[in-house]
């Protein structure tokens, strides 16, 4: 950077002494040397040859290392020729009249009014350039004025975009004046104000264009009066060998001054000062400093670098250029350490494809982005100080030192905007942050050197030669929207689209609204307008919105209420179960007497299992995870089959219920109650539920597989039980019902079909389809809405008298007696249920309590000892009437030999509810004389059972009655989808809402092995090798409780 003080010589004295010596030296000038510069054939000879020769001699003298106090006369001779324009400063020019037009132009250019007036007086108002020279020479008195002149010299008005600019004077091509010869400028005095003295007259014209305003699209320009001749107005076509092609310059209104921060607020900013540092750069180290349109210098190259080997430093221009278009080239200037020939050598060989767009600086001129959006800077001549050789290279032509090389603009329709009329611009404080261009990929345009072109150094940026200004802190990205000027940073298609929208007069908000509904062409623009910090995903099209709305509308407020009530209840229940498991662990550890370290280890194991359980609960299950082996039984609206889980090869009993049948028969509440009791039951009397899940058509219960069969199958085989066997089973049944009552449930469907016998001969309860816990979710009315038929499963229906579904006669019978018993079972247990074991208060709906289950115990005891139910009838309707009139229909046959205790227990259980045993719980039955031989204080399940079923292998199903695979349930299953669709009626609009919170997974899942298989009596004869493997795997499996 040039030093702030003047003169830039080795003289060490104050300013007043220097002025005095200058004046004395001017009175006694020394003889000038006759050595001159090399003059070309077309050089300008208007300057005195003696002056040129003297200056050349002074340069040669300065190249030598002079001592601090060198020859004084040579220094004065140097100063004399640099101050020739001010030779009359001590004459009558002080009283000369100041040209008001020139004064105004200097003030507009940023000069101080007092200094401008003094300069015009001292120069006699000859020209503006003379006044600027005076101001620059007096800049040591006021550094601000020196800075103003330096900025004016380094910058120039922007290039115009008019296709045919008006030429106010003959161009260089048509005059006798030719471009002066190339000569080197060296020495310290050329860094100071005397640099303009070396400028030929033709190049000074480009520093001071007219101040008139004109529209860019007009063919003619209006030119107000100027303080200098119109013959020196800038508009010329540069021909010659120095240029790769012709460059056309046109006049632009005002001075394109890039003012420094010291006087920026004193003068009105112009349209050119709104340029900012380019956001991206070409790959070849081509980046951009803050001053647009300029090339700044690099200071790290040696002065002896040959021509063409110096880097060029690019500063972006205002508008973009496109490949193949005759648009504005980037204005180039050589570095201070390079030759001017570098520019012309590159200019003739390097194709400039494009110039990257420079971003607008937010500190400058925020309100004028639309007045002249395509005006670029016109670069002024750049001074150099590194030309130490007095002679140019012989291989180079004689170029001039002008670096304001521009190209003719062809107006591109993309860059055209509607400009109504030029208006004077004033400095206004910013009221809104400037629109920041969206981040784009760096420009891919680079300088591609043709063959024979020199330039080994990459193009990079040097910020040392220009006044840098730090940008302000950025605004939040979500507050910055793209402006009209941002259209230059996108591709050509997006440019055309955005300009067409702006010409139609649409606002940014309108375009933002239309972009969400428009075509794919403005997808890029729509993405840039989205708020970047929003965490909510933005839906791209209206079709997704419609799908989302349809999904939301499909769930009614009733469904939301239904779901939330059950969900909150289950969340609370889950927490209570977690606390209960922790308390249970603490109690067990206290009983075992574990030390503190062992207890802590057990707690960690429980915590890990809790974490695994939470993760497994979220895993979705479906029926494809199981393989069906064999059907075990068929119920009213479902079936039970033996299934194997694929991953663990464990055997389960999987109960499947069709949703359509559950809804048609109003069994939603009963299914919910069955799921709840099976999930909550954690004792040895109830079949354990491991998983429950659902799909579109069915509900699935995955439970313990009890291989011993049910009590009904055993009754059919044995017909009549011995009294000791009946006593054992009724005692276990009493304990099982007691456990259900303690859980808060009523089974309501205790019958031999729902009593299973495990492999040890002990019983378990199953099929809680009619169970109720007196909960709001177990109430059938909670699931009913509209005009849906309200019918309980135990209410007589039309199918009760229809025994056409009984197919016992279709089977081949080996024994007539067995066939008759099977038909009797069909009569007792039809597909729609039987009232044989139901208490009369339940059938009469007079209100019932847990006593109804004890009625069923008396009926089962009667059937075990007698061989048939007490209210057997040909049809379910007749059976129901007999149950209701139990006082007249209940008779114990006289031919059956029963003990008095058994008769008494039957009559005390099958009686009115107010005098029935069990009012005080199961203790009433335990105290009955019939159980005198049973010790209820001991765990009865640990006692050996009178009857142990025969199980040959884990998948043995011989204890279950064979089931016809072509049963009505299977025939109807093919029409389940069709029947399911017909449920979408006004009375049952959303049937799937009834099965919320159905999914379940047990915490203690026994590692996938639900039961223990006993060793077969003869393994070699009863099991094949595959079955033996399964048997061995399940042999040692016991429930694992932490």
Curated annotation (Swiss-Prot):
Biased segments, Polar residues type: 30-44, 258-267
Coiled-coil intervals: none
Residue positions where Phosphoserine is found in the record: 82, 362, 534
Annotated protein name in UniProt: Serine/threonine-protein kinase LATS2
Location within or outside the cell: Cytoplasm, Cytoskeleton, Microtubule organizing center, Centrosome; Cytoplasm; Cytoplasm, Cytoskeleton, Spindle pole; Nucleus
Alphabetized PROSITE patterns for the sequence: AGC_KINASE_CTER (PS51285), PROTEIN_KINASE_ATP (PS00107), PROTEIN_KINASE_DOM (PS50011), PROTEIN_KINASE_ST (PS00108), UBA (PS50030)
Cofactors, names only: Mg(2+)
Stretches with biased composition (Basic and acidic residues): 507-530, 541-550
GO biological process: canonical Wnt signaling pathway; cell division; G1/S transition of mitotic cell cycle; hippo signaling; hormone-mediated signaling pathway; inner cell mass cell fate commitment; inner cell mass cellular morphogenesis; intracellular signal transduction
Residue segments, region Disordered: 23-44, 237-282, 378-399, 442-481, 501-550, 1014-1042
Purpose: Negative regulator of YAP1 in the Hippo signaling pathway that plays a pivotal role in organ size control and tumor suppression by restricting proliferation and promoting apoptosis. The core of this pathway is composed of a kinase cascade wherein STK3/MST2 and STK4/MST1, in complex with its regulatory protein SAV1, phosphorylates and activates LATS1/2 in complex with its regulatory protein MOB1, which in turn phosphorylates and inactivates YAP1 oncoprotein and WWTR1/TAZ.
AGC-kinase C-terminal domain: residues covered: 932-1010
């Amino acid at each position: 950077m040039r030093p702030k003080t003047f003169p830039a010589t080795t003289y060490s004295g104050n300013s007043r002494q220097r002025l005095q010596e200058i004046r004395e030296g001017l009175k006694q000038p020394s003889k000038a040397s006759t050595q001159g510069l090399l003059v070309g054939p077309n050089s300008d000879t208007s300057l005195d040859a003696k002056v040129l020769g003297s200056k050349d001699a002074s340069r040669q003298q300065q190249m030598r290392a002079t001592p601090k106090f060198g020859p004084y006369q040579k220094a004065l001779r140097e100063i004399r020729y640099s101050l020739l324009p001010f030779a009359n400063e001590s004459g009558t020019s002080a009283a000369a009249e100041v040209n008001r037009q020139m004064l105004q132009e200097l003030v507009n250019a940023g000069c101080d009014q007092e200094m401008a007036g003094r300069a015009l007086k001292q120069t006699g108002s000859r020209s503006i350039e003379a006044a600027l020279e005076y101001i620059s020479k007096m800049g040591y008195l006021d550094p601000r004025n020196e800075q103003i002149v330096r900025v004016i010299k380094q910058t120039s008005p922007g290039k115009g975009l008019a296709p045919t600019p008006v030429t106010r004077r003959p161009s260089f091509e048509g005059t006798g004046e030719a471009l002066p010869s190339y000569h080197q400028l060296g020495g310290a005095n050329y860094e100071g104000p005397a640099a303009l003295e070396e400028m030929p007259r033709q190049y000074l014209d480009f520093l001071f264009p007219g101040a008139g305003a004109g529209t860019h699209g007009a063919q003619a320009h209006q030119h107000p009066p100027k303080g200098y001749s119109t013959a020196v107005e800038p508009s010329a076509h540069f021909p010659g060998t120095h240029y790769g092609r012709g460059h056309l310059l046109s006049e632009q209104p005002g001075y394109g001054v890039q003012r420094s921060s010291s006087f920026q607020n004193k003068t009105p900013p112009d349209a050119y000062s709104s340029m900012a540092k380019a956001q991206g750069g070409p790959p070849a180290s081509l980046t951009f400093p803050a001053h647009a349109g300029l090339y700044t210098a690099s200071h790290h190259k040696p002065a002896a670098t040959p021509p063409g080997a110096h880097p060029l430093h690019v500063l972006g221009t205002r508008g973009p250029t496109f490949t193949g278009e005759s648009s504005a080239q980037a204005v180039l200037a050589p570095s201070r350490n390079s030759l001017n020939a570098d520019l012309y050598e590159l200019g003739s060989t390097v194709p400039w494809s494009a110039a990257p767009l420079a971003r607008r600086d937010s500190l400058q001129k925020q309100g004028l982005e639309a007045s002249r959006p395509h005006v670029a800077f016109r670069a002024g001549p750049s001074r150099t100080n590194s030309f130490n050789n007095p002679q140019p290279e012989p291989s180079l032509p004689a170029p001039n030192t002008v670096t304001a090389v521009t190209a003719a603009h062809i107006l591109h329709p993309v860059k055209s905007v509607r400009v109504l009329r030029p208006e004077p611009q004033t400095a206004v404080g910013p009221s809104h942050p400037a629109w920041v261009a969206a981040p784009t990929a760096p420009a891919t345009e680079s300088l591609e050197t043709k063959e024979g072109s020199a330039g080994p150094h990459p193009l990079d940026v040097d910020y040392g030669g220009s006044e840098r200004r730090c940008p302000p802190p950025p605004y939040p990205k979500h507050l910055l929207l793209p402006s009209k000027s941002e259209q230059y940073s996108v591709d050509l298609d997006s440019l055309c689209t955005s300009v067409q929208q702006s010409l139609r007069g649409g606002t940014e908000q309108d375009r933002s609204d239309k972009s969400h509904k428009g075509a794919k062409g403005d997808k890029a623009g729509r993405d840039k307008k989205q708020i970047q910090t929003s965490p909510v995903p933005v839906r791209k099209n209206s079709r997704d919105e419609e799908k989302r709305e349809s999904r939301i509308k499909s769930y009614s407020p009733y469904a939301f209420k239904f779901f939330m009530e059950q969900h909150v209840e289950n969340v609370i229940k889950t927490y209570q179960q977690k606390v209960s498991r922790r308390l249970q662990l603490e109690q067990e550890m206290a009983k075992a007497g574990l030390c503190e370290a062992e207890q802590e280890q057990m707690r960690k194991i429980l915590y890990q299992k809790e974490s695994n359980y939470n993760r497994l609960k979220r895993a979705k299950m479906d029926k494809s995870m199981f393989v069906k082996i064999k059907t075990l039984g068929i119920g009213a609206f479902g079936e039970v089959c033996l299934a194997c889980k694929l991953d663990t090869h464990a055997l389960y009993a999987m109960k499947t219920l069709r949703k359509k049948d559950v809804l048609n028969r109003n069994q939603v509440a009963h299914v919910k109650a069955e799921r709840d009791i099976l999930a909550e039951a954690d004792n040895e009397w109830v079949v354990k539920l491991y998983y429950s899940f659902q799909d579109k058509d069915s509900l699935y219960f995955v439970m313990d597989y009890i291989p011993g069969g049910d009590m009904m199958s055993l009754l059919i085989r044995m017909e009549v039980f011995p009294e000791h066997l009946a006593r054992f089973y009724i005692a276990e049944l009493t304990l099982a019902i007691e456990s259900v009552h303690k859980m808060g449930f009523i089974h309501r469907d205790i019958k031999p079909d729902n009593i299973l016998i495990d492999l040890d001969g002990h019983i378990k309860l199953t099929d809680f389809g009619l169970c109720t816990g007196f909960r709001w979710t177990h109430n059938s009315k909670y699931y009913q809405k509209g005009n849906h038929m309200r019918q309980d499963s135990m209410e007589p229906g039309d199918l009760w008298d229809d025994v056409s579904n009984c197919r016992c006669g279709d089977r081949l019978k080996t024994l007539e007696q067995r066939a008759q018993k099977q038909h009797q079972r069909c009569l007792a247990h039809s597909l729609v249920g039987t009232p044989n074991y139901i208490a009369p208060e339940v059938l009469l709906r007079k209100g019932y309590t847990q006593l109804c289950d004890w009625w069923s115990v008396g009926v089962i005891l009667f059937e075990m000892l007698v061989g048939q139910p007490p209210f057997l009838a040909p049809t379910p309707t007749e059976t129901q009437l007999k149950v209701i009139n139990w006082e007249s229909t209940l008779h114990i046959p006289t031919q059956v030999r029963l003990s008095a205790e058994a008769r008494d227990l039957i009559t005390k259980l099958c009686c009115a509810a107010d005098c029935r045993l069990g009012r005080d719980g199961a203790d009433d039955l335990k105290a009955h004389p019939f159980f005198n031989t049973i010790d209820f204080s001991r765990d009865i399940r640990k006692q050996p059972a009178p009857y142990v079923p025969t199980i040959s292998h884990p998948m043995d199903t011989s204890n279950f009655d064979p089931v016809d695979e072509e049963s009505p349930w299977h025939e109807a299953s093919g029409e389940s989808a069709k029947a399911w669709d017909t449920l979408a009626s006004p009375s049952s609009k959303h049937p799937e809402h009834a099965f919320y919170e159905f999914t379940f997974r047990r915490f203690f899942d026994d590692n996938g092995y639900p039961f223990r298989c006993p060793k077969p009596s003869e393994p070699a004869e009863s099991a094949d090798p595959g079955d033996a493997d399964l048997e061995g795997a399940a042999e040692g499996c016991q429930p694992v409780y932490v």
